Structure formats: C-alpha cells, structure tokens
Amino acid sequence: LHLLSRRQRQMCIRDSLGGALLLGTYFLFAQKQPVDYVNPLMGTDSKISLSNGNTYPAIALPWGMNFWMPQTGKMGDGWAYTYASDKIRGFKQTHQPSPWINDYGQFSIMPMTGRLRIDQEQRACWFSHKAEKATPYYYSVYLSEYNLTTEIAPTERCAYFRFTFPETKDAYIVIDAFDRGSYVKVIPEENKIVGYTTRNSGGVPRNFKNY
C-alpha cells in the first residue's frame, strides 16, 4: 500500500480541481457559436436629425431572400425600428438596404387580443426591451397590452412565427400589405392565406408585386 504524503495529496486535489475547471470552461465556450455574440439591436438608437445608427434588428439567414424585423415606425417610414420607441406596430418582412433608400415589397403581421384594431396607430402595442430577445436567428417579445408573446425564426425564403395567446376567444392576426394596389385573401377551408404587396420606393417595374 502506497501512502501519499499530505503535500502530495494537496497537489493531486489541486490538479484535479484545475482540470475540472478547464473542462467546465471548455464546455461553456463550446456551446456558443460566433453568431451568439451578434447583437442585432446595436445601431438601432437612430435619430433622423443626426443620421446616426440607421440600422434595424434583422432576423435573417445570410443571403436570405427576405429579412424580418419588429416594426416601431409608421408604414413606409425608413426608420422602421428605433430603440427609443416603446410601441410595436407589427412584424415586417423587409428588403430595406438603408432608411434613406427605404423599403420595397414589404408587409407586416400583427397579433392582438381584445377588440380588433386594423389602423396602425390603434393597434400599436407597448413593449419593453426587458421582455425582448434579439438574435439573428431568433426574436421574441412580449406585447403587454395584448398579453401575448411573438417569436420569429427565419428561413432561407420566409420565417416561422409563433404567437402565444392567452385563453380568449378574441384573438386576431392582422396582415397589412400597406398599399391599395396590394391584395390579401384568406382561404379558411385550406388553412391558407395568399396575396401580394405592391409597396415600393421607386425603381421597380410597373407590374411589381411581392407574392
């Protein structure tokens, strides 16, 4: 039987603890990917007067056909999301390169409870950044007035939405295609919604439509 001295036992314990800490640190960092360090909200504290920030929190895959974003600005406003805002008007599909060039082929989706409100001013809902999570691959926010949570995950061409409503019979989803030339049709028997938006900021063909 080989007996270790007190000094040797202390060294073995220290080495074991050191190895465990290193292993734990490795697994902690191994779980994170580079995309997890991206904060889409950076640069969104935009001010038109200074032309600073001028970004929006894109929820999208690299080179995705469409980007998605929470919308705090009015319909057609190039500054569609500003960090200082406290109301969300919808969740928008966007192709916007900059606020000055503005957007094209956009539409928005807005869930709500209670009384149905179509107008963008009336349907706008309070939210807090404390109840908002933004990453390039996942977005969620709690809409306090409607007591519901919206979640978005992008795909190459579209996005998955999940709305968690409270128990109520008065739950709605408003689809806003912005312009009068746009078209939306609900087909209940097929669980399908089809349509297109004609919204643009110029430089498109006369028959432009985003289906």
Regions found by a protein language model. Name each.
Residues 1-15:
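Single conserved hydrophobic/aromatic residue that forms the stacking wall/gate
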Residues 31-211:
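Accessory carbohydrate-recognition regions in carbohydrate-active enzymes
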